Amino acid sequence: GAQWINTLRDYAFPKIGRMPVDSIGQPEVLMCLSPIWTEKHETARRLAQRIKIMLDVAKSKGFRSGENPITAIHDAQVLPKVKAKPKHHKAMQWQEVPAFYTDLKTRDAMAAKALMFTCLTGSRTGEVLGMQWDEVNFAARLWTCPADRMKGGEAHRVPLTDEMLAIIEPLRAMKSKYVFEGQKRNKPMSNMAMLMLLRRMQVEGVTVHGFRSTFRDWASEVANAPREVAEMSLAHKVGSDVERAYARSDLLEMRRVLMERWSGFVAGSVGKVISIEKRV
């Protein structure tokens, strides 16, 4: 399926995609696995399995001979042992999000509105809770989160969809400094407000931050979005410093198409949304 090929596309093809299949050995496979073996171990493990299958098929068709380098790497224990890390930000499966969002829409609490917006934008909790009206350009359908609230230290532009605007536009009437005002006038909500709402909804184990992972999985598995577009949607830095210096675009319009489709999926209006395959 799409997820199978996407793993190879993102982590193997850039390094070994143009090589003759009979010239791929341990050093070439390690070039793909080593950079992500510790930080993204589960992804690296799946990548190794898929490279192994690919090379086994090539051997069965007579395109290569000898031992599979994945088997040799495993037997020689070339790569370090990785302790299973606890999942700090447990994520909801993307298939479960529309039903969860429908439930969320029935709730009037400000925390529910903030959580809906967080889920749709894939933003970090602090970015949403600190959101102020002067950061929003309704005419351009754009929210610019300033650098001082961004983990990466750079301002981030977020395209606003109809569903996102439907959440925040009614809140303008409150005339607060903050879009999602807390219990005190002109003060933001507590950073625990959305998490406590999840607990009241009896959504066990899921964290607010986890919705970023949910979006990322959906973007790869369902939308088949280019890696750069999906990563930039989460305000992740893509490429080396030199590559970023040359690629000055933040891919806003491509991200807008992706976020429109995500909003349509989450809010149950998929049929109205333009297919990203045609645009991205």
List PLM regions with ranges.
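Active-site/catalytic core of tyrosine-dependent DNA strand-transfer enzymes
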Residues: 40, 91-98, 140, 149, ...
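Short, polar N-cap/turn motifs at the start of nucleic acid-interacting alpha helices
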Residues: 67, 135-142, 205, 224-245, ...
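Hydrophobic (often cysteine-bearing) scaffold residues that line and stabilize catalytic clefts
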Residues: 4, 25, 43-50, 93, ...
